Amino acid sequence: MAKRSEPIRKSVKEILDDLVAGHQEAAYGGPEAALKYLRRTFENQGSLPNAVKAVAHDLMADAQAQAGDWEGCAASAATALGHLPDLEAAFPHEYRRLLAGFASFERGIQAHSELGDFHGALELCERAMALGLGAHYEAKRDSLEWAR
């Protein structure tokens, strides 16, 4: 009797690498193609690791901003940022590098501003500053101070 082959189990890093590579390829077709790829990934991957979900939602927020879907962008950015602890737990040595490339802060601030939710934009500026992501978030916060 033939031995049943074991299912292929990928590491979180391998799953993340596959997601990023697939997204890069899809993004050549524009933000709509990137969104289609990411939506299919969520539909077909029933159990993406939460750390990978952080990056997937971050990529989705960026594509939604490019497409002008501000409500979707704000929601995706919030979801991505909600998974940051999972990202840090899965990639403790790469977390700062991954965080530096995260678009969710920038795109979330943009989305909240476009939607007229300046308090939401301010909160994201404060959160980015607390994580030490750069002085430009302090400048953004200062430009939104009037909304307090």
Residue positions per predicted region:
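Amphipathic alpha-helical repeat scaffolds of TPR domains
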Residues: 10-24, 48-68, 78-81, 85, ...
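Structural signature of alpha-solenoid helical repeat junctions
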Residues: 52, 72, 95-103, 133, ...
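Boundary/linker segments of alpha-helical solenoid repeat arrays
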Residues: 49-51, 84-92, 130-141
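TPR/TPR-like alpha-solenoid repeats
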Residues: 63, 111, 131, 144-148
